[in-house]
Structure formats: C-alpha cells, structure tokens
Amino acid sequence: MITYAEALRLLLSEAKPIEDTETIPLMYSTGRVLAEDIASPIDVPGWDNSQMDGYALRVEDIASASQDAPVRLPVAERIAAGKIGGPLLPGTCARIFTGAPLPPGADTVVPQEDVSREGDVVAFSQTPQIGAWVRRQGSD
C-alpha cells in the first residue's frame, strides 16, 4: 500500500492536459467535456420562481416566528405555475406552486410541509433564510 501523498504524486505525474479539441454536432456530444464555457443569451430561469409548493412571503413579516409563538398571515392569493401574481402586501402571504413566478415583494418561499393552515390563515413557526426555496432569475 502507498501513502496518500505518493498516490497523489503518481497521479499528477501521469495527468496530462487535454490540448486537442474538436467541433462536433450537439447530438454526438453525450459523454463529452466542453473545451470552453458557453453562456446562454437569455436568463434561465427567466424570472425568480418557487422551488416548492408552499407560501411566498417577506421574511421580515415572520421574523419573530417560533414554535411557542407562531406568526399567522392571511393568504392573499393563489399563484399556480405559469400564472403571475400581483404585488404581495406586507403582512400577507401567497399560496404558490413549484415553478410559479415569485410575486413582487416576496423574498422567500416556505414549503407547505413546514406550516399549518386553518382556512385562509397560515401559521409559521420558524423563520427561514431570505431567498429560501427561491430559484433566482438567471441562476442556471
């Protein structure tokens, strides 16, 4: 058996940079490695959107939430994937589904599994990080 340092030295001594490249049709590129970075001319995704089914909100509206003292917010609207919601008013949340655009004013999504809902009011018992469960415009 050889040491880690010796194994690393052997690997590095045998590794050679790839200097030859070729241009091939995309359909034949499976299993290949790009020779240089490519950049999309458009943002993917094209807008901030939800990564989960849940509730879009402003973190500042539930900053004091805890297990002992949950913060309750009314549901102002329902935003399905492919639909655009209106601006989120302070002190409210929006029911949002995976892929749906984040409404203006919201900065975070809380998954439906992490809340309790009674009628049109949702109880939040923890404060997420700003940007949680949000796929940002251009992040891909």
Residue map of PLM features:
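Short, low-complexity N-terminal leaders and the immediately following helix N-cap/first helix
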Residues: M1-Q67
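Short, glycine/charged-enriched hinge/interface segments at domain edges or termini
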Residues: I2, A56-D140
